[in-house]
């Protein structure tokens, strides 16, 4: 079945599109964009003028929680929520139980994502075993299993030598390292950005230098 969307505004930065275009869909597949093509027999849908038609969004920081924390989220529910909001691809952090620091967990996540058959899922492996910041994960194994990047998610890698090795190995496999830049010894028990407003509210401040030092490193 063919459907013709008449769009008041279509945006596709990759193709330099930003304006009023028609979009022809054939059996769920986008087949043609423009305004001069054969759409005979197609169902015509006028897209509301305040809507924007664009390619699916990508979320690079998602907590799917499965395996191990299904009471918070599952791959099924997380990917369903993603596509409902227009996100057709997501990268999931390794904060699972067990942590995604080996091929077995990565393959489990990908199998579950295939079974859910909704958003595309790109696993992010852990920098360190168990995200404990002590022993480097097998980055080659994670890459081979399907990880697209490495990160210890919300845990900063305090060991500078471990981070250096992670960067060196990740570079060999052309994998980004997503770092949580925060020096916990400087953060202390702060709960708000250090400054006038934190002081006025009586809140312990978080100094900006706690993040800046980790970035500079």
Task: Give the predicted meaning of each segment.
Residues 1-41:
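N-terminal metal-binding scaffold of metallo-dependent hydrolase/deaminase domains
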Residues 60-73, 94-96, 122-135, 202-209:
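Active-site mouth loops of central-metabolism enzymes
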Residues 71-79, 131-141, 217:
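Short, acidic/polar
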Residues 51-113:
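Metal-associated gating/positioning segment near the N- to mid-region
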Residues 8, 23, 28, 50, ...:
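Divalent metal-coordination and catalytic microenvironments
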Residues 37-53:
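Active-site metal-binding motif and surrounding structural segment of the metallo-beta-lactamase
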Residues 77-100, 117-129, 143-158, 174-182:
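Divalent metal-dependent hydrolysis catalytic cores, especially in the metallo-beta-lactamase
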Residues 136-217:
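Histidine/acidic residue-rich metal-binding segments in metalloenzymes
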